[in-house]
């Protein structure tokens, strides 16, 4: 059998993702501490348990979360959702996260196991119903409650909490499974009142990424004072434009959760939906969530490319997003990207079967499709389809150059409206099959 030289070269391209995407320092919000340990759930002895806690007691913290829409919701998802509803998104002081076991499809015993862990943390904090449980790992296995409980004791009794960079980096490491690098993002922003506020986020995920909220976990904390209803609205808006706009393999997990806590440690006027600063905060959180979500795609299992799919001039944002998602989830598009094949027919096919809310968003005689180079090289744009007509004389050499980039963009102009949406995806390689074929062994 003759081997494909181009694919061999592609597979051999080595990128040190840890060096590229893991920060060396950061800024962190007031009033939060994190602690992590190796409880023994992971067979390799790596960190597998982390706790985020709020130490600001001057006001009740606001909390919000967006959960998986998978019908088989994991026990920690069910429990966390109920707690947030019962407490109207206020007074959440901790999140306990274990990796290595998803506590999913475990029935009532899984619910009880999750409740045991949060009760343990609450007892350490001297509170009641103020902790949310989160889990990630293998589906269908019961939680190792004894090991994790001992890990909780170790974190609290040995005061393994900290608010420095290393503590946060270890926290990010503790929630990893098949991730090749921990995902940590920090940012500081100002509002017109002159005060500065801080956002810190961690995430895990490399496979099973096709959220409507996969296995994907994300946590954002801030010292901004904000009403819980406003926080929920902002997080939903941000998630719909970030974590719900990423795809690695098209699988949706049972455990997906994006959670945000705002403790108001910077004591300024509380923000609500009517505040002048509301839209600015929404934009800040959305941009921040996009940075964090993109790291998940950059760590896509076995991936060699990070691809932005931008759909412009649609009748609605929703239809632009549906088309971007359809392209991003197409295995034929993903494999063509890996093979550096400028197969625009696969892109058009994915656009054509997208289940649009408004069929008028797509007019096949107006559509334009291009590859966009992101490295500054010229020509930046390689047109594949113009006003619905395929460009039969494509510069194959230029196409190969663009498709050889680690970062590139697929641009789609529908020409039917003014709305736009973006999705972030990656290619699918031989290594993806190897990683997931060997996952439980």
From Swiss-Prot:
Its main location: mitochondrion. It holds the Pfam family ArgJ. Substrate binds at residues 177, 204, 215, 301, 436, 441. InterPro entries: Arg_biosynth_ArgJ (IPR002813), ArgJ-like_dom_sf (IPR016117), ArgJ_beta_C (IPR042195). HAMAP family: ArgJ (MF_01106). Belongs to the ArgJ family. This is Arginine biosynthesis bifunctional protein ArgJ, mitochondrial.
